[in-house]
Amino acid sequence: MTFDAFTKVVAQADARGEFLSDAQLDALSRLVAEGNKRIDTVNRITGNASSIVANAARALFAEQPSLIAPGGNAYTNRRMAACLRDMEIILRYVTYAVFTGDASILDDRCLNGLRETYLALGVPGASVAEGVRKMKDAAVAIVSDRNGITQGDCSAIISELGSYFDKAAAAVA
């Protein structure tokens, strides 16, 4: 079962039979203060998801044209659609992780066993990882645009966002 940050803190305090500590409350207060930034981040990525995936795939196939050549892993419309679907699923779970501030949903529901599945299907993990890195670059650029977003230092959330993409790329490579 996946727990959010609040549930984890309460479960830890309850297991010890203690009230929440000042340090725990301060940490949760900071998380709440960052909540609007998380929502803005997820909204921006979600609103641009189609272009993030399409542009990452386009750039990947431009760099690795053998993927879309006859016999390539993304050759035929069915395989191309599966590739785009998988990229979109990874992006979606990255947004869930950013929203909750917890990578476990990404690990448990998306990445767990993905490398093995790709190996069994003959999908080149290095190419998938490169596609994920291209989505990371696009998502970070979109989130880093300071126009129309909650003001303040967003470097921590941007770093966190990047770490989820890095985790996904490493999981499939």
Curated annotation (Swiss-Prot):
Q: How does it sit in the membrane?
A: Peripheral membrane protein
The residues that hold (2R,3E)-phycocyanobilin 2 are 154
Q: Localized where?
A: Cellular thylakoid membrane
Q: What function is annotated for this protein? A: Light-harvesting photosynthetic bile pigment-protein from the phycobiliprotein complex (phycobilisome, PBS). Phycocyanin is the major phycobiliprotein in the PBS rod.
PTM N4-methylasparagine: list the residues: 73
A Gene Ontology biological process noted in the UniProt record is: photosynthesis
Native species: Synechococcus elongatus (strain ATCC 33912 / PCC 7942 / FACHB-805)
Keyword Zinc tagged: no
Quaternary structure (record): Heterodimer of an alpha and a beta subunit, which further assembles into trimers and the trimers into hexamers.
Gene Ontology cellular-component terms for this entry are: phycobilisome; plasma membrane-derived thylakoid membrane
Q: Where does (2R,3E)-phycocyanobilin 1 bind?
A: 83
Task: Fill in the PTM field for this protein.
Answer: Contains two covalently linked bilin chromophores.
Q: Which Pfam families match?
A: Phycobilisome
Keywords (alphabetical) are:
Antenna complex, Bile pigment, Chromophore, Electron transport, Membrane, Methylation, Photosynthesis, Phycobilisome, Thylakoid, Transport
Protein name as it appears in the record: C-phycocyanin beta subunit
